[in-house]
Amino acid sequence: MTLKLLKKKLYTALSLLACCLTVFSVKGQANANNAITVAEANITAQSDVISEDQVIAVVLLAGGKLTVKSTSSVFSHNLAGQPSLSLGTLRIKGKNIGSTALSAQTEVPLSPLEQTIGTGGAVLATISVDYRVPTGGTIWLAGTYTANVNYNVANFTPFYMTVPAYITATSVVPASAPITINSFGQFRSVAGASSNNISLGYNTTVPTVIDLKAKTSSTFTFTPGFTSSLTFTPVSSSVLKATLSDPTGPVGSPITLSTTDKSLTPPAGLPVILTNKRPSLNTVFNIAGADLLANFVNAGIYKLPVTYTIAKTPAFNIAATSKTMDSSVDVTVANMMDISLPTTTIALNFTSQSNYSSGVTAAVTDQVMLSSTVPYNITVKAGTSAFVNASDATATIPLNVMTIEGMSGQSGITPIQLSTSPQTIITNGNPVIDRKLNLQYRIPSAKVLSAIFGKSPGNYNATIIYTIVAP
């Protein structure tokens, strides 16, 4: 009898204990579904991140309703000093209790205020919710954002929103950035010559710097546009300047190219912007007029391979894979020639006895101005058959009375006697910009006596033509 009574008491005690456990299990343990990844694809498309049917607890829904609030004020970034996100960035909606949909499902933005997101019966079961994160209108920084999410059935302290670190190019730099030199005015100008804008576009969740360098060599390679035995001096990459700009103007300071990476961006880099897209960044390459004049006189193609690197700023302490892109700056100097005569009227006057006895000379400083990007010859000829008296066309003086030669100190000029046939005064001159020739026109005394003395008084005129031609 005593043994049976003890068994009954033990059974009763066990039943009461089980009942107590059921009654007091009102708030359960938080499930592991306490994180959302805001993927690159969503940020790029500016589409919502959806995470459905996330179990938050296995519990009896006390009072028949599911509520949520946050004991945090913001979603804080894991790196100190970085901007936070508002709690409302995360949207939450009650979903199911067990296999049954919650009633009165309501999506709410997370806030410090307790809000009902669904109702249901007092059944011991899994409770699930849907999460939604709109990506539009938010600047997403790589890293982890945390805030407390407090349900009346479970706590997520903290809840995580993770943003991957990425730099993804959205445009491909062209194989070459052409700079075309097809005018002597470019050599004479201060500005020189520039490339068209080279567009850079990329998406990113990290602050970025854009570096540029000469890829493999500190000098341009050169392919001449003419056949010559000339020795060409290599042109340094340092004559090439690059500037980064956006639609509002320059983004950083100009850099000179070398084989060392130099930043096109300000020291602090470029911040992540709304939409996380960096379009409309343009690189302009420039060579100043003085550098063109000193280094790019020879016609041909000057080529400098370059490398762009887009990387995270050193101060942003989350790793991101850098993006490199190769291009080439191609400077094409056209085959060009030009010749001009600043002084177009030359007078040799026979007004005294000594003019007839000693001859006459007219010296003209800067008589010829010439430019050529290829080797050249300069020829001279008369455009008329003789010097003709302006008052009497039958009165003439032979062309060959006149010698054209360089003034004292002027080198490289071959003297000629004027005729109607082209005669070369400069042979195979090297490419040059704005070379000035100091010439003199001379009628020696011997020619005066043989061809001029005794002629009718008056002005005798002839046209003289200077021509620049390829050798």
Model-derived regions, located:
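Intrinsically disordered, low-complexity sequence elements enriched in Ser/Thr/Gly/Pro
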Residues: L5-K7, S25, T89, N276, ...
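Bacterial N-terminal signal peptides
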Residues: L14-T22
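Extracellular adhesion/glycan-binding regions together with long Ser/Thr-
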Residues: I97-A125, P250-S280, G412-K436
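Bacterial N-terminal signal peptides that target proteins for export
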Residues: T2-L14
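N-terminal small/polar-rich segments of proteins
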Residues: V26-S84, E114-V239, P271, P279-L399, ...
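A surface/secretory-pathway sequence property marking extracellular, secreted
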Residues: N78-V108, G225-S263, N389-I416
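Helix-centric, low-specificity signal for extended rod-like, repetitive segments
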Residues: M1-T2, C20
